[in-house]
A protein has these predicted regions:
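Extracytosolic ligand-binding ectodomains
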Residues: 1-176
Length: 176
């Protein structure tokens, strides 16, 4: 068989294990998969990576707020933030904004605030908001491509951003 690519839908350490074994077995078909977790990709190493992936956030984003977050985080910890660090930071930021604007920590008041369409700076080009019917955070995601080894600056520099999805002219509901 000569597939165009191999799609994997694994998370966490299962990604790392798969990527390393895929390399060990000498398989060369391009890879693609569900949401890329940055830390398992760093653990697998650039030699075990290939293909296109989905990402919620990547430290290579160039929005001013992402650049500032990455710079501050990297300065404090010595490596760039991964997508989990971004998620933790953004969740705390959203909650602080909601508490400040409602002047309350009451769950019902916070839910009402979120359901009325409040928008949040989530370190991306587009703001995020919560959908009323299921409280899903509506946000853009990214297609990332594993970098050519010759272009990699360090072990953290593994991907390049291809595009944001959905496009700026499209509703965030498109991918939710």
């Amino acid at each position: 068989a000569k597939p165009d690519f191999v799609y994997i839908c694994l998370a966490g350490v299962d990604q790392t294990t798969f990527l390393k074994q895929y390399k060990e077995f000498g398989l060369s078909f391009p890879l693609a998969g569900g949401v890329m977790d940055t830390i398992p990709f760093w653990a697998a190493g650039i030699d075990s990576l290939s293909g296109h992936w989905q990402s919620l956030w990547y430290h290579g984003l160039t929005t001013p707020q992402s650049v500032a977050f990455t710079k501050k985080f990297s300065g404090q910890f010595g490596y760039p933030p991964d997508n989990q660090a971004w998620g933790d930071y953004v969740a705390a930021k959203i909650l602080c904004q909601a508490i400040a604007e409602t002047k309350s920590t009451d769950s019902a008041k916070l839910i009402e605030y979120f359901e009325k369409g409040a928008s949040f700076d989530i370190l991306k080009a587009r703001k995020g908001s919560f959908r009323k019917r299921d409280h899903q955070l509506l946000q853009e995601m990214y297609v990332v491509k594993v970098k050519d080894k010759a272009k990699v600056k360090d072990k953290w520099d593994i991907c390049e951003l291809v595009e944001a999805v959905p496009k700026a002219s499209e509703s965030l509901e498109l991918i939710q």
